[in-house]
């Protein structure tokens, strides 16, 4: 089997359920999407190919539209990014979740129903109620700050720092608090290569000044 064949069968086995939940299957997004004026959700599956074996996993991509539009301008980008990507392992409370997402091995058509069921069950148990929570800017901000506090490399980088500053600006935090975070984030990037460091420093300064 090829990945496109597996994806088509997963769609066949799950589309009716997700349609009822307000999602639309989008092939290029690897799964199901839901869009409002405030956010864009992509809940679906990513895979690694070791033909004839494929390893599938479940992932939730969360894009807060206003945050990402500002970040796009700040970095002079081309496409909107994701405010954060949640792997199923996060919801399962797995230690070092960022690198330990559960995997479903698919080699034959008979392996697919178990993954399709997991996609539905995980949504019902974890993701459905999480979406209205995490798409609130204040909750996303608190989540990102918690992740930064863990010291994890995945959360201590310019992408997360700049999004935190954007959220603080949008939520009208006192400028003193924002500047305190700015100083903290700049110190965390102090070891970066000089040219990159100056780019990120300028981007963060522009966010704090509202230059977008």
Regions found by a protein language model. Give the residues of each.
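Intrinsically disordered, low-complexity regulatory regions enriched in serine/threonine/proline
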Residues: 2-7, 33-212
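Amphipathic alpha-helical segments
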Residues: 3-26
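Long, charged, glycine-rich C-terminal linkers/tails
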Residues: 26-33
